Amino acid sequence: MARFARPLALLFPLLWAVACAEQAPEVVRTPTPPLPTTTAPRATATPLPGSGAAAPVVADESAPSPSPTPAYDPDSPRAVAPYRGIWLAQQELEQLPMSGAAWENLLAAADQPLPGPDIADQDDMSDVYLLARALVYARTGNPRYREAVLDGIEAVMGAEGNPRKTGILAVARNLPGYVIAADLANLSAESGLGPAFRRWLETMRTTTFHGSGGSYTLSGCHETRPNNFGTHCGAARIAIDLYLGDEEDLERAATVFEGWLGNRDAYAGFIYGRATWQANPGTPVGINPPGAEIAGYDVGGALPEEMRRAGDFRWPPKRTQYAWEALQGAVVQAELLSRAGYPAWQWEEQALLRAVQFLHAIEWEAQGDDQWQPWLINAAYGADFPAHSPARPGKNMGWTDWTHGQTSREQAGNGANADG
């Protein structure tokens, strides 16, 4: 997009907002109880609603008012500086190869023309392809890729459509790629577009979306839905928390995730469906505990809320892709939290490793747009699950055969075996 065309592009979200204002879309801010101050992130987090009484919200009247942010000028110079590394840091990127199948696949994706982003479309892939451009920029320093990322960030603001019609799953799947791309391109250095994107993220995380799947904010979905909806919402929520520097909500989100993995003492406020795949129906969890059995069959590591999508318990299980789909959101949550200092990959006796071991035990390997997951899981655990390269990107993440493939290979002989 040419620079002189940007002011016109910015008018469309504004005109849409004016039109939608007459419909009074509901914007709900999910209250967040204050959590105790700690010197480091905790492996066990503060109980939340569903696991005990939440502390009341106390307004900090002494907090200074935020300084006004400058108006966005699309023709202003674009600064380039080191970025924070929500997903990868500069020193990590510098070690990654610029040759091989994974790199060539990433480069081809970065050079692919993109249609306008549509966050209201749960199958839109603009987010992961914009992430490809950001990764190539961060590795090569080629400014045209950064310019393309900034164009994409500019275009996505307002692409969520009418909250009364947009579904929360679409929003959750599409947001992480944009957030991480913005971090890789050091969008915060932009005096106008940077603050504009931050304000938009604040709006996205507090807006109630009423489309298919129910009416939720990102945090409300994360704390209620123990299936793929909730895991994707958690990934988007955590990515935004990290980008905005919201440590309080980050800790709350970590607590919810730990509860989903199986620590009901941390959080147990989810609403589950049929419990026929739960090892302990009276105390349902997102991932069955180690050694769990149903009718004499080992179901430790199974995702009950997704396994039931193919029907009540039976053996062998009827195949469903929902288990891998839920893991797309879960492994992104774990990686983001791990980089922020939370030992999320280790929680509940390495629950995510056990989940993948269960799927391999019943011969359900990652296929299609789940192919990126084994690279990340192998890197996290030093495991050796089958991993394909070039790997297809997923609904909320991709390119891990390049970003994490080297780590996977280095750790394969030193960590957990894929068979347990």
Where are these regions (language model features)?
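Active-site neighborhood of glycoside hydrolase catalytic domains
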Residues: 247
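C-terminal motif of bacterial Sec signal peptides marking the signal peptidase cleavage site
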Residues: 17-19
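Ser/Thr-rich, Proline-interspersed low-complexity disordered segments
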Residues: 22-71, 75
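Bacterial N-terminal signal peptides that target proteins for export
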Residues: 1-9
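Intrinsically disordered, low-complexity acidic Ser/Thr-rich regulatory segments
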Residues: 293-317
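Extracellular glycan-targeting catalytic surfaces
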Residues: 58-59, 63-225, 231, 235-236, ...
